[in-house]
């Protein structure tokens, strides 16, 4: 630690690593995804070699159910009140006034307070999520319904400029 002090190096824990990866929109397989999530759903379509004539999994990725618009896709969420942190696993609805049982359109996969941004951030799997960016959704919580705006999953340095130092 002393050797790193001139470079502002400090100790950190695993929670800090979780927050940092979420700020950049980096996912944890199995937490932000499940067995139903395809690469395009998780914003990982860039990793597929689409110019190749064939590859393992190509046929599977073309299945109608894997390209349906209503698939659950990974998005970012920002609560209207930045002090309110969503609960991981919380269900998401479009209309909080609908009769019970409510139609759930997704769930929160990761949720943290970002000291860098000075507010809470979350990631969620939402039906047709990529097409809904900018829309407001509702998250029933123990203390009431919380409004959240659908955003990109990259909350901090979305263009990666800080990585290009």
Go through each PLM region and give its residues.
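Conserved, structured C-terminal
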Residues: 1-165
């Amino acid at each position: 630690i002393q050797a790193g002090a001139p470079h502002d190096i400090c100790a950190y824990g695993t929670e800090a690593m979780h927050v940092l990866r979420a700020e950049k929109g980096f996912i944890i397989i199995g937490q932000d995804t499940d067995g139903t999530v395809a690469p395009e759903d998780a914003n990982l379509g860039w990793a597929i070699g689409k110019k190749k004539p064939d590859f393992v999994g190509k046929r599977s990725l073309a299945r109608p159910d894997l390209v349906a618009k209503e698939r659950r896709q990974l998005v970012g969420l920002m609560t209207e009140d930045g002090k309110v942190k969503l609960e991981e696993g919380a269900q998401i609805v479009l209309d909080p006034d609908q009769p019970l049982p409510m139609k759930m359109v997704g769930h929160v996969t990761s949720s943290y307070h970002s000291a860098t941004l000075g507010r809470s951030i979350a990631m969620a799997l939402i039906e047709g999520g990529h097409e809904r960016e900018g829309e407001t959704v509702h998250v029933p919580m123990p203390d009431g319904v919380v409004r959240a705006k659908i955003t990109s999953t990259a909350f901090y340095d979305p263009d990666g400029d800080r990585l290009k130092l």
